[in-house]
């Protein structure tokens, strides 16, 4: 999908780029698959802030996406390719032979009019979903489950893909986009292919207002704050913070490991970032 630039009639347009949405076939979503998205502004029920940098943004409705791909043995035709404001990838509306309609993530190469299938007997074709035990080693997959039947939790953002490296007993070895190699139960579902909208990572936001449309508020550095607001705050004039980087709550950051989940350590074969 090509990226367009703008004639710099304002300073922000000089650096701003955007996707050419020539792959989108309709701007009218399927209403039965829309639900209202309640916005919190980063605040909990008591009204105090729990997530910084959240708030504002354009109103959105959630599209109900089929992450389980559990409609086995029923062929579905791709009716439309649509924009989804809640994710980086495009979504495809699938019209099944029994009349039901569902949204799925659009993989690279999936076009309107194509037919897809889910289930152990499905062919190894882009958009088809199968258990990992039925997928040959070396295949590129996305939309991967961590627990059978729970629905996909990994490899769902634009341009993402994992590679099925091998199968050992009850587990399949997957090379994830982060570089991590992980064991996943062999009965978990995965979809063939790479998630679409691969040029998403090449878009330049260009201006602060475009992030505000998304509901992302400004991020201030700790050294610009007062001591009451951040451990790096205060000092006479510009300072370096005077200590190693920490979060606003005093925990070391920038490379400091905080992961503490021994229960799933056994499933990680190679950590991300390591050869």
From Swiss-Prot:
InterPro entries the UniProt entry points to: NA-bd_OB-fold, Rib_uL2_dom2, Ribosomal_uL2, Ribosomal_uL2_bac/org-type, Ribosomal_uL2_C, Ribosomal_uL2_CS, Ribosomal_uL2_dom3, Ribosomal_uL2_RNA-bd_dom
Keywords: Ribonucleoprotein, Ribosomal protein, RNA-binding, rRNA-binding
GO biological process: cytoplasmic translation
Annotated spans, Disordered: 212-259
GO molecular function, one term: rRNA binding
GO cellular component, one term: large ribosomal subunit
Matching PROSITE patterns: RIBOSOMAL_L2
Pfam families in the cross-refs: Ribosomal_L2 (PF00181), Ribosomal_L2_C (PF03947)
Membership in a protein family: Belongs to the universal ribosomal protein uL2 family.
Role summary: One of the primary rRNA binding proteins. Required for association of the 30S and 50S subunits to form the 70S ribosome, for tRNA binding and peptide bond formation. It has been suggested to have peptidyltransferase activity; this is somewhat controversial. Makes several contacts with the 16S rRNA in the 70S ribosome.
Quaternary context: Part of the 50S ribosomal subunit. Forms a bridge to the 30S subunit in the 70S ribosome.
PANTHER family associated with the record: LARGE RIBOSOMAL SUBUNIT PROTEIN UL2M, RIBOSOMAL PROTEIN L2
Name recorded for this polypeptide: Large ribosomal subunit protein uL2
């Amino acid at each position: 999908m090509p990226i367009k630039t703008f004639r710099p009639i304002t300073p922000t347009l000089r650096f701003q780029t955007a996707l050419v949405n020539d792959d989108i076939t309709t701007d009218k979503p399927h209403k039965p698959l829309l639900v209202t998205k309640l916005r919190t502004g980063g605040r909990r029920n008591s009204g105090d802030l729990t997530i910084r940098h959240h708030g504002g943004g354009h109103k959105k409705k959630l599209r109900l996406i089929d992450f389980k791909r559990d409609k086995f043995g029923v062929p579905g035709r791709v009716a439309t390719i649509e924009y989804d404001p809640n994710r980086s990838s495009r979504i495809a509306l699938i019209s099944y032979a029994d009349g039901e309609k569902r949204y799925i993530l659009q993989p690279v190469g999936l076009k309107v009019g194509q037919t897809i299938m889910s289930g152990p007997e499905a062919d190894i074709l882009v958009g088809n979903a199968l258990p990992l035990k039925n997928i040959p080693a070396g295949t590129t997959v996305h939309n991967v489950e961590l627990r059978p039947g729970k629905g996909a939790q990994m490899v769902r953002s634009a341009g993402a893909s994992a590679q099925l490296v091998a199968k050992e007993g009850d587990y399949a070895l997957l090379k994830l986009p982060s570089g991590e190699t992980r064991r996943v139960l062999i009965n978990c579902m995965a979809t063939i292919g790479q998630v679409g909208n691969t040029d998403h990572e090449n878009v330049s936001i260009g201006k602060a207002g475009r992030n505000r449309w998304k509901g992302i508020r400004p991020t201030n550095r700790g050294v610009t704050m007062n001591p009451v607001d951040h451990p790096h705050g205060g000092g006479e004039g510009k300072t370096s913070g005077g200590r190693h980087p920490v979060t606003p709550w005093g925990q070391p950051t920038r490379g400091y490991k905080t992961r503490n989940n021994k229960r799933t350590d056994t499933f990680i074969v190679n950590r991300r970032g390591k050869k």
